[in-house]
């Protein structure tokens, strides 16, 4: 509740700043939620806390403000209809998962940690309207690595930054993946379910964002009519 109320408050002041706060925090929370869902989190029941979780190092990095993440779903030819997603996840000869394809309209696409929904299974029954969704898997992709010499090795290519009417303080990017190393989250074919784990929470956050923007508009109207 505190998280959503603070989202509302920040949206009232500046929606781009709110996006950085709520979206990047949500990526850290999603890492924890995904780890719990797949069974890679252990709990210290006696003290009522988490003992360990799969992505603890990444979560700590985000919490320190040293990195942030994003959710890569939309593609040039597929958005709301996720069954049409074509970005592909496959294993190489050594069992390493790799992502190949394109994603567009990605909020904070310049971030370090990317949750990528990609196709790992082909449709077996074309007459099944849900066949395309069952072939999706969730991956965590590191967009770049920082090198000891201060340089940076980039794995995910930023093709362009979108031009927008607003939200100028928040980056929206088009991305390309060319055999980029990835970590599978959960099991193959569970990508749609994992996506809902993140997006259902995000929908509530967007609602609070809308409340904040409405409050801002009402206050601006009050000032305009009294001056």
Question: Positions of the model-derived regions?
Answer:
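A short, Trp-centered hydrophobic/proline-enriched beta-strand micro-motif
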Residues: 65-73
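A structural signal for short hydrophobic beta-strand segments in well-ordered beta-sheet cores
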Residues: 87-90
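A glycine-rich, basic-preceded beta-loop-alpha segment at the flavin cofactor/substrate interface
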Residues: 146-159, 164, 171-202, 220-227
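Short Gly/Pro-enriched turn/cap motifs at secondary-structure boundaries
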Residues: 77-80, 105-107, 129-130, 164-171
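Internal helix-loop-helix
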Residues: 1-56, 60, 64, 106-109
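A short core secondary-structure module
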Residues: 96, 100-153
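Flexible loop/turn segments at secondary-structure boundaries
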Residues: 25-30, 38, 77-81, 105-108, ...
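Alpha-helical interface subdomain recognition
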Residues: 1-13, 22, 50-51, 81-82, ...
């Amino acid at each position: 509740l505190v998280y959503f109320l603070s989202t509302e408050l920040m949206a009232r002041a500046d929606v781009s700043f709110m996006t950085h706060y709520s979206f990047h925090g949500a990526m850290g929370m999603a890492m924890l939620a995904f780890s719990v869902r797949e069974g890679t989190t252990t709990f210290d029941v006696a003290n009522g806390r988490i003992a360990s979780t799969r992505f603890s190092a990444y979560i700590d990095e985000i919490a320190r403000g040293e990195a942030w993440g994003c959710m890569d779903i939309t593609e040039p030819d597929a958005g709301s209809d996720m069954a049409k997603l074509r970005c592909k996840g496959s294993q190489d000869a050594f069992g390493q998962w790799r992502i190949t394809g394109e994603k567009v309209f990605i909020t904070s696409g310049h971030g370090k940690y990317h949750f990528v929904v990609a196709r790992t299974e082909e449709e077996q029954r074309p007459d099944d309207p849900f066949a395309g969704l069952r072939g999706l898997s969730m991956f965590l992709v590191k967009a770049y690595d920082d090198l000891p010499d201060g340089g940076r090795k980039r794995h995910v290519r930023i093709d362009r930054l979108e031009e927008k009417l607003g939200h100028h303080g928040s980056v929206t990017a088009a991305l390309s993946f060319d055999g980029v190393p990835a970590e599978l989250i959960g099991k193959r074919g569970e990508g749609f379910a994992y996506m809902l784990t993140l997006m259902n929470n995000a929908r509530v956050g967007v609602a609070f964002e809308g409340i904040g923007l409405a409050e801002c508009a009402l206050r601006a109207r009050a000032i305009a009519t009294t001056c």
